[in-house]
Amino acid sequence: MSDIKVLALDLDGTLTNDQKLVTPRTRAALDAAIAKGVTIVLASGRPTAGIQPLAEELGLDKKGGCILSYNGGKIVDCRTGETLVEKTLDPALVPELCAFAAAQDIAILTYNREGIVCERDKDEWANKECFTTKLPMIHVDDLASYVNYPVCKMLITLDPARRDAVCAAGQQQFAGRADLYPSSPFFIEAVPRGVAKDDSLAELLRRMGLTRENLMACGDGLNDRSMIAYAGVGVAMQNAEQPVKDCADYVTTADNNHDGVAEAVEKFILRED
């Protein structure tokens, strides 16, 4: 009998294929896991509103489950809508992050209840976030002035060739005040200091009376490393970046386009010993 009670799943490059769809075999594996009493946590850098449609598609609003959004900045109960965990950026950092992006001549965005907020509505890389989240782009003239509400993260979008250099510069400038790290070839996350998927999952497990040994986590990106290393069973997709594979207990033989999540769920949760 599996000790896994919580299954945390990254979305893009993990649960969904490159068309942003959950395949039938993977959906069936998740339904079977839920039937065994496993709580599904959709754990992503996406905003909450960008995860909600998938949660509803999987029936988590009725069967139960959680949305972990903003790479751990917020956790919401799918069934009740209750916010279980929320961590926001220091408001003073918002204009400084905007100025940093402007100095680098790159786009930076954040979110409100209606969609994605950005000064550059035609930016190629910023529009990738619209495709990923299925949220509309809201163009504003001055993002720093517009953001007068708490935000869980800001997202820098840029040409992949510039990612590492810009990220290093940002990490130096905001050291000790915010965490900046890449989450895809063209995204750099800016989140409150110490916010990560593992930290928020640990808080959720405490609320549930469970431990890390009851957690299985699946992911592919650098922002998934913390939860994969933390989980009792950490799983990296075949398509994961090498540092992610290096910290995993198991690497799937299939990638996200060929039911890698289903492979892991069948192996560690559904298999009867």
Task: For every predicted segment, state its role.
Residues 26, 51-55, 166, 170, ...:
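Hydrophobic packing residues within well-ordered alpha-helices of enzyme cores
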Residues 3-19:
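Asp-based phosphoryl-transfer active-site loop
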Residues 57-61, 85-86, 125-129, 197-198, ...:
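Short, hinge-like loop/turn segments at secondary-structure boundaries
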